[in-house]
Structures are given as structure tokens and as C-alpha cells.
From Swiss-Prot:
Quaternary structure annotation from Swiss-Prot or TrEMBL: Interacts with GNAI1 and GNAQ.
Matches recorded under SUPFAM superfamilies: Regulator of G-protein signaling, RGS (SSF48097)
Span list, region Disordered: 1-27
A Gene Ontology biological process term: positive regulation of GTPase activity
Keyword Metal-binding: no
Cited function: Regulates G protein-coupled receptor signaling cascades, including signaling downstream of the N-formylpeptide chemoattractant receptors and leukotriene receptors. Inhibits B cell chemotaxis toward CXCL12. Inhibits signal transduction by increasing the GTPase activity of G protein alpha subunits, thereby driving them into their inactive GDP-bound form.
Bias type Basic and acidic residues, positions: 11-25
Gene Ontology, cellular component aspect: cytoplasmic side of plasma membrane; cytosol
Compartments (UniProt record): Cell membrane; Cytoplasm, Cytosol
Membrane-protein topology: Peripheral membrane protein
Keyword set, alphabetical order: Cell membrane, Cytoplasm, GTPase activation, Membrane, Signal transduction inhibitor
Protein's name according to its UniProt entry: Regulator of G-protein signaling 1
Residue ranges of coiled coil: none
Length: 196
């Protein structure tokens, strides 16, 4: 059986689509696994950079401020940077819809009355409806109660569902967050930087 001969030089192949060969050779890049991991971690935790600004002031985020997050979920969520770091943690656990819903409810409470209906429907469709893409984990009664309340929306129509999600985060996600590498590495890095 005759063997097939392939030239070592792609240009010697006649009748082939040179653009396909060029694409394949251009896609080869040096392996930079370590750099990719660092880039991934930075995207997950952008707050590890030493120049991170605090949400309360123009000061750099301090280890004391981050340590206060361990006192309660309320203190963590009262801090913009805390919300961001906790949100990144929830993303790593595939449960970011909880904080997204909680933040949407907080924003909703500041809504002008003429915009309530539109905003309530958006939040309901995004998080509460049984077919929502980012459906939150609430019981049937709370889901039905919220559905009724948005028919005549008030600033408090999501309060019951928001409380359920807050309790879920407080009892489930928040304790794991405090033990996570995301939180502990951030705290350790800030403590190390303060000693310099």
C-alpha cells in the first residue's frame, strides 16, 4: 500500500487553502498557564491590588475595614467593596443571583413612584418568576405573595422575598465566605501591606 507523503513546509502543499494553514500556525502561542491563572484570579478578586480605594473614603482599603466584614453580613453589605468581593465569591459558587436580587431590591426602594411598576416587573421577571433566568431560591408562598404585590407595586413589595434571600445568604453563603480563600487572602494581603 503506497504511503502518503506530506511536505514539512506548508507552502509546498499545492491546492490547499493557505489561509487555513496560516490560521493554525497563528493560533499557537507559548504556554503561559501561570500567567493565565494570575489573570483569572485578578478578574475574580480585583480587590487584591494594594491601590484599592475604600468605599467610605478616599483612603486605601484597610485590613481593619475588611475585618469588620466578619462581624455581620449587614456590615459587609454596607460597604461597596464588601459587596463586590462577596459578589465575586457568590459567582464562584454559582449563586450570584442572591446578591444581585438583594442589590436590585435596595435600588428599588429608592425608586420614584412613577417608575415603580416598570422596575418591579423587571425585577420580578429577572429573579422571582418561576421561569426567571436568575431565579432566586424562595418558597412557593413568598413567590406567589410577591407576584400579587407587584400588580399594585409599592416600595415594599419585594421586602418579604428580600428578607428570605438575606437570611439564606446570612446562614449559608456568608459563613463560607469568611472561610474562603477570597476573603482570607484579601485580609492577609492587606495586613501584610500595613506592616510594610
Amino acid at each position: 500500500m503506497p504511503g502518503m507523503f506530506f511536505s514539512a513546509n506548508p507552502k509546498d502543499l499545492k491546492g490547499t487553502d493557505q489561509s487555513l494553514l496560516d490560521d493554525k500556525t497563528q493560533k499557537r502561542r507559548p504556554k503561559t498557564f501561570g500567567m493565565d491563572v494570575k489573570a483569572y484570579l485578578r478578574s475574580m478578586i480585583p480587590h487584591l491590588e494594594s491601590g484599592m480605594k475604600s468605599s467610605k473614603s478616599k483612603d486605601i482599603l484597610s485590613a481593619d475595614e475588611v475585618m469588620q466584614w466578619s462581624q455581620s453580613l449587614e456590615k459587609l453589605l454596607a460597604n461597596q467593596t464588601g459587596q463586590d468581593v462577596f459578589g465575586n465569591f457568590l459567582k464562584s459558587e454559582f449563586s450570584e443571583e442572591n446578591i444581585e436580587f438583594w442589590l436590585a431590591c435596595e435600588d428599588y426602594k429608592k425608586t420614584e413612584s412613577d417608575l415603580l411598576r416598570c422596575k418591579a416587573e423587571k425585577i420580578y421577571k429577572a429573579f422571582v418568576h418561576s421561569d426567571a433566568a436568575k431565579q432566586i431560591n424562595i418558597d412557593f408562598h413568598t413567590r406567589e405573595s410577591t407576584a400579587k404585590k407587584i400588580k399594585a407595586p409599592t416600595l415594599t413589595c419585594f421586602d418579604e422575598a428580600q428578607k428570605v434571600i438575606y437570611t439564606l445568604m446570612e446562614k449559608d453563603s456568608y459563613p463560607r465566605f469568611l472561610k474562603s480563600n477570597i476573603y482570607l487572602n484579601l485580609l492577609n494581603d492587606l495586613q501584610a501591606n500595613s506592616l510594610k
